[in-house]
From Swiss-Prot:
Expressed in 16 olfactory receptor neurons in a broad area across the antenna, including both anterior and posterior faces and in the maxillary palp. This expression pattern matches the distribution of the small sensilla basiconica. Expression in the antenna is observed late in antennal development at 93 hours APF. This is Odorant receptor 43b. Residues 71-83, 161-193, 293-299, 394-403 are extracellular. It is a multi-pass membrane protein. One of its GO terms (molecular function) is ionotropic olfactory receptor activity. Pfam families: 7tm_6. The chain crosses the membrane at residues 50-70, 84-104, 140-160, 194-214, 272-292, 300-320, 373-393. Keywords: Cell membrane, Membrane, Olfaction, Receptor, Sensory transduction, Transducer, Transmembrane, Transmembrane helix. It comes from Drosophila melanogaster (Fruit fly). It is found in: Cell membrane.
Length: 403
């Protein structure tokens, strides 16, 4: 992974860079998690894959309910809520990880569509934009990594400060409540085991926005090519064959983008649906904990956790919203591209292409609702609803009495 840090900065034109390089970090993380993306796993990596899959999809999600059953009476309210929000997130993480395992081949298929789109980027300005896109998305992934690592570390420090474990997962034969030694042992065990899952989560949470953001760059490049079709400075505007070939290239690029959406949509659909549902519940629990129970030091970790939760949905919703607007601009650009001065064949092709462009590229969650900023706002409203219900039930007083 560290060999790819050069991708943080835009590469010069002389250096070969592809759109698929924008997800190099994310792919390397998935490979380290056990996904055999290159079909080159030996015995050692296959054994690691069994351990990784078992821990991420079985042991970690189950460890929270087991701990609740055994030690529920010993949970203070703020620790119970803090553990519950992480429990919900790990269930969603297990679902996303399983989905990526099932649809691993679609990630490579999407990258092959990126390779096709790169073939249409022949001008130096287009190549520079691709390099800028790779650097921007690489930084976006690093933002996920920094926020997630900051959350893991701050939770560990807060736990040590309050003489408790950071995540409250279940470990047989270890009871951190007995003495300090067992508390330190479980704290650092959790930091490395749950921390590994958090490391994998940087990929499972970021892959939708990484692919969609790269797609948007190619949509904007296509818009520039369509605008250039009707540009008076276009030297080939008087050559019908050249103009028709340029138009056909735009159509092929658009078709490749639609194929890309078909490839990536099944992966995004189910995972983001679960993410929206879980995210609203998690944010509601966070609000209850922060307002009613958490102290100042714990609130810092909660704020970092809120940032991590928002990263799971907001950037993707933003880019999906932007793509819908960009698709409308594609149709407007083609309509104003002086197509009426070309020959009949060109005009007929433009009309058919225009009909296709009027259908925006949209991503949906289980074909129930569109992924956009309006949906993200509704998730936030649901979080306020959860908090309002808890406040109306005087949850703080009831939990304090039980404590």
């Amino acid at each position: 992974m560290f060999g790819h840090f050069k991708l943080v900065y835009p590469a010069p034109i002389s250096e070969p860079i592809q759109s698929r390089d924008s997800n190099a970090y994310m792919m390397e993380t998935l490979r380290n998690s056990g996904l055999n993306l290159k079909n080159d796993f030996g015995i050692g990596r296959k054994i690691w894959r069994v351990f990784s899959f078992t821990y991420n999809m079985v042991i970690l999600p189950v460890s929270f309910p087991i701990n609740y059953v055994i030690h529920l009476a010993e949970f203070p309210p703020e620790l119970l809520l803090q553990s519950l929000q992480l429990c919900l997130n790990t269930w969603c993480f297990a679902l996303k990880f399983f989905t990526l395992i099932v649809y691993t081949h679609r990630l490579e298929l999407a990258n092959k569509h990126f390779d096709e789109l790169d073939k249409y980027c022949v001008k130096p300005a287009e190549k520079r934009k691709v390099r800028d896109m790779v650097a921007t998305i690489t930084r976006l992934y690093l933002t996920f990594v920094v926020v997630y690592v900051l959350y893991a570390t701050s939770t560990l420090l807060d736990g040590l400060l309050h003489h408790r474990v950071p995540y409250n997962t279940y470990y047989p034969f270890i009871n951190w409540r007995v003495d300090r030694t067992q508390m330190y042992i479980q704290s650092f065990l959790e930091y490395f085991t749950v921390g590994y899952a958090i490391y994998v989560a940087t990929a499972t949470d970021s892959y939708p926005v990484i692919y969609v953001a790269a797609l948007r760059t190619h949509i904007l490049l296509l818009k520039d090519r369509i605008i250039y079709l009707g540009d008076p400075s276009n030297e080939g505007s008087s050559d019908p064959s050249y103009m028709f070939k340029s138009l056909v290239d735009c159509i092929k690029a658009h078709r490749t983008m639609l194929n890309f959406c078909d490839a990536i949509q099944p992966i995004i659909s189910g995972t983001i649906f679960a993410q929206f549902i879980i995210c609203g519940s998690i944010l509601g629990i966070i609000m209850i904990n922060m307002v009613l129970f958490a102290d100042q030091s714990t609130r810092f970790g909660i704020v970092i956790y809120v940032m991590a939760v928002l990263l799971q949905t907001f950037p993707l919703c933003f880019y999906c919203n932007a793509i819908v607007d960009d698709c409308k601009e594609l149709a407007h650009a083609l309509f104003h591209s002086a197509w009426w001065v070309q020959d009949k064949r060109y005009q007929r092709t433009v009309i058919q292409f225009l009909q296709k462009l009027q259908q925006p590229m949209t991503f949906t969650a289980m074909n129930i609702f569109n992924i956009n900023l309006a949906t993200n706002i509704n998730v936030a409203k649901f979080a306020f609803t959860v908090y309002a219900i808890a406040s109306g039930m005087n949850l703080d007083q009831k939990l304090s009495i039980k404590e």
